[in-house]
Amino acid sequence: TFHLRRGVTFSDGAPFDAEAVRLNMDAIIANRLRHAWLDLINEIERHEVVDSHTWRLVLRHPYYPTLIELGLLRPFRFISPSCFIGGQTRDGVRGLAGTGPWILKEHKENQYALFTANASYWGEKPRLQAVRWKVMPDHQAILLALHKGDVDLVFGADGDMLNLDNFDAIRREGRYAAAISQPIASRAIL
């Protein structure tokens, strides 16, 4: 059973309440095959609105990574009910109004995404007013942009942004803070 924080709104002003959670979970479950890689999807027996700020998730079996998997952006990033098309997401969405500290302001495919601070965010406010995420698929271009000062941050070092050799070289150089986070879950193949 989840007790939702009161006073939280989506960036479009709609309330984040148990009904919004229900709508989002219904859409995720309706698209179950897209998310079959996530075991939690197959463990959901039902979910229900208890009251305006209480939502209950019932699983088929005890499942230890439930809270970890609910924290995954994909597929559990919730959007405002106004973004749904006919109460569904199967055919896309009308917008991307969420409850987080950032609002997607502009997006140019394969170029960049511009995020601005969400003034109505319920938590600690962002220290920056805007962040531009550049798409730079070439490892050498990323490294050059970092050294020239064209980018302030490189996110990801598992081969999708910088290869690990470049990451280790940057860490040894000492000019930049460099860290690798712990994984959120471990799996064993026997």
Residue ranges and their predicted role:
Residues 1, 26, 33, 95-97:
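N-terminal lobe/hinge region of extracytoplasmic solute-binding protein
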Residues 1-11, 181-190:
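Periplasmic solute-binding protein
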Residues 3, 9, 15, 22, ...:
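Surface-exposed binding/hinge segments that line
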Residues 5-7, 21, 26, 52-54, ...:
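Solvent-exposed coil/turn segments that connect beta secondary-structure elements
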Residues 9, 26-33, 64, 120, ...:
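Sec-exported extracytoplasmic/periplasmic mature domains
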Residues 17-26, 52-58, 100-101, 128-130, ...:
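Alpha-helical secondary-structure segments
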Residues 46-47, 105-116, 132-190:
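Extracellular/periplasmic solute-recognition and catalytic clefts
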Residues 52, 62-63, 68-130, 140-141:
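Gly/Pro-rich hinge or "lid" segments in bacterial periplasmic/extracellular proteins
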